[in-house]
Each structure stands twice: as structure tokens, then as C-alpha cells.
Amino acid sequence: MNRRQIEQSVTEELASADDRLVAAYLFGSVARGTDSSNSDIDVGILLRTAPSGELNDLRFELDGHLERALGRRTQVVILNNAPPDLLHRVLRDGRLLVERDRAARIRFEVRARNEYFDLLPILKRYRRREAARA
């Protein structure tokens, strides 16, 4: 499957997903076009607020559903509680596939970008220290 086919399949599979799904992004090597036959398919999902256990149950459910439908390993990540650096990579390199609530998606993206840029000076200092140790 090429990227376009994967995008279409993921979009179709998530079209009937749980009502709590707000948005979904394809990210990682498939979205960048650098995947190989061994690469998994990374899908980030933004969900309406729900208890943590319910979110994980839904993640496992969607992960299994996508793996069966695509015939390839998938990794579904709940974006609601993902770290800022991962959210930055999803928004920078990812492709929005599903959007059920535009306003909620935009609020999420603005918040995620603000958190990342607030954290960026700390990340840069940390990376410089790690590079100096190597």
C-alpha cells in the first residue's frame, strides 16, 4: 500500500469509529513518505474527554481494528495526553485525515503548539547538554 491508499483506508475505517473521535492524523514515517515494508502505521487520535481507562480501551479497540483492516502493524496514539514534543511532530509532519469538530481540533492544535513553544527553550538546553556529554 502506498501513502495515499493508507490514508484512504484509515479515513474509511475511522469514518464509523466511536462518537468520541474528534480528529485523526496519520504521522510518522508513512506520513513523511520514508516508510518501509516493516514500518508501522502511526495514527494519532484526538478524543472528547472521557475517563482515562475508557480512552485506553478505545485506543486498543481502534488499534486492533486498523491492523485487521490494513493488514499491517499500527500504533494508535491518544493525542489528548501525549507529550508536547510528540504533538509537535504530529502537527508538523502529520496529515489530518478525520475532522469531526473543527473548533475542537483548532483549539487542540493551538494549545499543543503553545505548549511546545513554551517548552522549546528547555528542550534546546537539554539537547545541548546531552550533545556535550557525547
Indicate where each model-derived feature is located.
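Catalytic core of pol beta-like nucleotidyltransferases
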Residues: 1-23, 31-37, 48-134
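Short, aliphatic-rich beta-strand segments
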Residues: 42-45
